Amino acid sequence: MWGQLMIKNRFVTKLLITFMVLCFLMVPISGKIILKETENLEVKSDLPTSFDLRYAEGFNYVTPIKSQTGGTCWAHGAMSAMEGNLMMTGNFQSPGEPNLAEYHLDWWNGFNQFNNDDDPLNAGLEVHYGGDYLVSSAYFTRGEGAVYSPDANDGTEADIPWYQTAPARFDPSYDIYYPRDIEWFVAGPNLENIDIIKEKIMTEGVMGTALCISSQFMDGYVHYQPRDSSYDPNHAVAIIGWDDNKLTQADEPGAWLIKNSWGSDWGEDGYFWISYYDKHCGQHPEMGAVSFQNVELLKYENIYYHDYHGWRDTLKGVQEAFNAFVAKGDEQLDAVSFYTATDGVMYEIKIYDDFIDGELRNELYSKTGVIDYTGFHTIDLETPIGFAAGDDFYIYLYLLDGGHPFDRTSEIEVLLVAKSQGIVVKSKARSGESYYKSGSEWKDFFYYPFDDWSHRGTANFCIKALTNSWNPTGSELYCDDVIALSNVKPLSLVEASFSIENIGEPFSNLNWEISEWPDWGTWTFKPKSGSNLKPENGPFNIEVKFLSPSKRDTEFSGEIKIVNIDNPSNYEIVEVTVATSKTRLVSGVAQNLFERLSLKFPNLLNFLNL
């Protein structure tokens, strides 16, 4: 009911959602209970004045210090956060501590001159010299990493085996770790959101961040860049804790404890501090505080997407969008992923079987919920949906606030330790992949009229389908209808209907056809055959038209046979009885001529629109 209300009246929906949030305050999302404002207030009173993930209640949740080669700090910052979450959850599947492959991300992120699937010329970033957390997120959410392989590690802080030469992009020996959620936080100009960041560090582990590293901002391994400084961030690191009483160059105390990637012989055994009041750390919207959460061994065999480069822009003012996909094999849809561009977003996911004449049809699944924080999210389907090879399907996403994140050709604005600025990374799109709702009409995003012509024809929404192999289960044709008509005028056009249904296993596909019908009269069926009818579609109606026999005051009987094409032994019979009246519709020669013409030219009925 809520989904229908949302689509029919957005204004009323906003009022209803506000009322729901104020009344209930608790909304279940993916197995968690998200407390709105009440939760944040409660957490604030319980947070310690200092915290260190290396000594959290007697446990260490930080992997060892690395020594980066080249401009790969961004890869080390992201992997430190991924590894930290794995240590907290215990989801790492190999012996020892997690040691993920920074240089696989460095080579195969898809934004650089070595590899960009969207650009055959491979223009873009220079390998080993640039990236950020949006780049790493695009790579993770495609399911290409994070890679764990013993071959990537040499037991030293440098872990350099894969730096000089690119490793294989895919290898069956790799373990791939996937962050189900990635969240971006901003502490705020008055640190009004700092407790959220602290709570996430305590519950989700190490968090990625960035700063403008410079001797002018560093004093005894304590960093502080004033807010009025114009320098952009140039180095990525990771937050592992804090101290509210740590004195810094800022007017007020308080600092983040930072894990660097310059070896353990730098700083305080590889660590240092950044003031709470730093310009970028905890403040930059894309690099300030990034939490990689619910990291697990990738459990999906395929990830369908059109947004190769992930979240590059947001289409404001649009709430409804969908992506179209075609199953490459027999697969079941187990999860959907997407980004939200603001906090506290109510979403609705729907899966459709068809997009016909500008309308999404045959809804197979729906789910609603609330996403508490900005970022990337993976939503499991309680009941997987099976699709046969070649079957098209459509993932609809309604986002109440913030607009729809999308990929497009873009200039990388935050280019850490890069040799040059203003690098353009090309994306590509095709017509028929992404659609957005404009008024009451679905429009192909491929033709969106961007002001910048270089963006046109390159944009796709960040909506992904996560699938596994599926063994199609048996479909079963069912029909219990009959056609029984009385007092039918001879040689008259008769209209009737019956319905069929697939009562087989969930999400099985029924392919059917009408193979037999009575040999009296002239018959047409709309449609006469069909495919991919699922149990979830419910009854499917078939329209029947026939020219009644010319003989008066007679009862005619016959059968309509519908067959399951994939299992001919599964068929249904619709019994037909027609009793003609004593009165003719026409008489004499005209009647006989009409009958003969109808029999000789079956399309005559359609031509006459009878």
Question: Where are the language model's segments positioned?
Answer:
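Beta-sheet-dominated interaction scaffolds and their linkers
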Residues: 312-315, 319, 327-329, 472-504
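Surface-exposed binding patches on compact interaction domains or structured appendages
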Residues: 449-452, 472-481, 504-544
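Catalytic-core signature of thiol
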Residues: 33-332, 342-367, 373, 408, ...
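A short beta-strand micro-motif common to beta-rich folds, especially ectodomain repeats
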Residues: 554-566
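Short, surface-exposed beta-strand/loop patches at domain edges
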Residues: 398-471
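Short, surface-exposed loop/turn segments at beta-strand-coil junctions that are enriched for proline
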Residues: 384-386, 547-553
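Secretory targeting signatures
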Residues: 1-33, 498, 584-610
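Aromatic- and Gly/Pro-enriched, solvent-exposed loop/edge beta-strand patches characteristic
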Residues: 343-429
